[in-house]
Amino acid sequence: MVGRLKESPSQEMIDLLFKPSIRSDLKHHYSYLLKINSVHLFMLKSEGIISDEAASKIHSVLTHLQVTGKEALSINPALEDLYFNVEAYIIEQTGPEIGGQMHTGRSRNDILATVTRMRIREEMLEIYELVCTLRRTLIDLATEHTSTLMTGYTHLQPAEPITFAHYLSALLHGFERDFTRLYNCYAHINKSPLGSCALASTTFSINRKFTMELLGFADLLENSLDGIASRDYALEALSALSIFSNSLSRFAQDLYTWCSYEFGYLEVGHSVAVISSIMPQKKNPVTLEHIKAKAGHIQGALVSSLSVLKNTLYSHSRDTSMESMKYTWEAINETKAAIRLMIKTLQTLTVHKDNMAATTRQNFSTVTELANALVRHYHFSFRTAHHIVAEIVNETLNQGLGSDKIEASTVERAIKQVTAKTVSVTKEFVEQALDPERNISLRTVRGGSAPVEVARQLQQLEQTLASDHQKISDLKQALQSADQLYKHYAAELERGAQ
């Protein structure tokens, strides 16, 4: 019999709900729960709500649990959760009149809300560092390839010549925004719900700011009901993770395509590929396949959490506090795995520069600049020049040739056909207009693909990355300072017990 219940939990409740939850909490939440217990205890003593003697005895048991680890507990799943098992152990060691004081002025509702925020805060910090490592890897790779010629594609058709660095710079700008979105989640995560109690706070004169500071939170949730009901911070994090995973998946798809034999632009290393059981020639870039798939899992977690929360009351319930968070942790793990796989894949990447350049010279991606040259030198309107070059492309393709074989006579015939004008075109004019390196070098406008402009972009990306590293360092330093304060109060309590 527990509380007002006259029967023990059913075996189904124990096997399907309590045991899995306790296993997960022991693995992931044990240290957070003990720290919350200790901080709440320090506060109760500081405010004179419990005696120094009671605080000292309880703290001694909590310290033992921290030092010994979860193995110190003999878990009884019928007690429902990890909190009740910890409390039962403390009461067993100190007696009900001492150990029972630990729960003064709080509820499992605000405890679990606090645990969840502390865990997701730590997980997000790890993701911030991984995203920055990915950006560092990309900046280093781009710096090596500011002059590496390649084709830019739209609709997966040759469009215009760019450099590999210009492509990577585009991704870096996207990942920079992803970092900002992920970082901005932290301010909403890092607010303390502790002291909200069940939902209406408490009649004990607790000091919420005290526990907030020792647990490393930057602010308080100002409404006790909101403190135990809110899970929007998790949805916000899942949304940012989903957007980031989408960016990462699109990147993986490009690499995957360019690693094919038909493109032959890139090749992943042997350490990140697998073979076929039957086809000897195979070297499959499977890390990219997993990265793409993991984006689906992450986005599915967002939809799952939204779906669970949408019909819950704005208060505490198990579907709010537990079921809605079920796949959040999996999404976080999938995100970390996807980033690590991408970093490793990039570190092994071989760029086949010759293939990239040869394809770009032949696949008509340079002919837009031929149209531009006709506008500048022969004063055609751009639309007329567009028609002329379209005729040139058709004639060249019909001859089974590439754009590197376009001749001055071909241009003259197309001009005659479209405008009925006879114009003399030199070989040098055509070669210069179709030269991909020259084509790219002229694109010096801000954001353009000229090597000098891409170098400027990379320098700016480098500066922002350094700033973002500092932001992470500041967040970690704040937690370390809070931990030092926590250790101060722990030592003070231990000295008083001597």
Curated annotation (Swiss-Prot):
One of its GO terms (cellular component) is cytosol. GO terms for molecular function: argininosuccinate lyase activity. Pfam families: ASL_C2, Lyase_1. Pathway: Amino-acid biosynthesis; L-arginine biosynthesis; L-arginine from L-ornithine and carbamoyl phosphate: step 3/3. SUPFAM superfamilies: L-aspartase-like. It is found in: Cytoplasm. GO terms for biological process: arginine biosynthetic process via ornithine; L-arginine biosynthetic process. It catalyses: 2-(N(omega)-L-arginino)succinate = fumarate + L-arginine. Gene3D superfamilies: Fumarase/aspartase (C-terminal domain) (1.10.40.30), Fumarase/aspartase (Central domain) (1.20.200.10), Fumarase/aspartase (N-terminal domain) (1.10.275.10). InterPro entries: Arg_succ_lyase_C (IPR029419), Argininosuccinate_lyase (IPR009049), Fumarase/histidase_N (IPR024083), Fumarate_lyase_fam (IPR000362), Fumarate_lyase_N (IPR022761), L-Aspartase-like (IPR008948). It comes from the Bacteria. Its EC number is 4.3.2.1. Keywords: Amino-acid biosynthesis, Arginine biosynthesis, Cytoplasm, Lyase. NCBIfam families: argH. Belongs to the lyase 1 family. Argininosuccinate lyase subfamily. This is Argininosuccinate lyase 1.
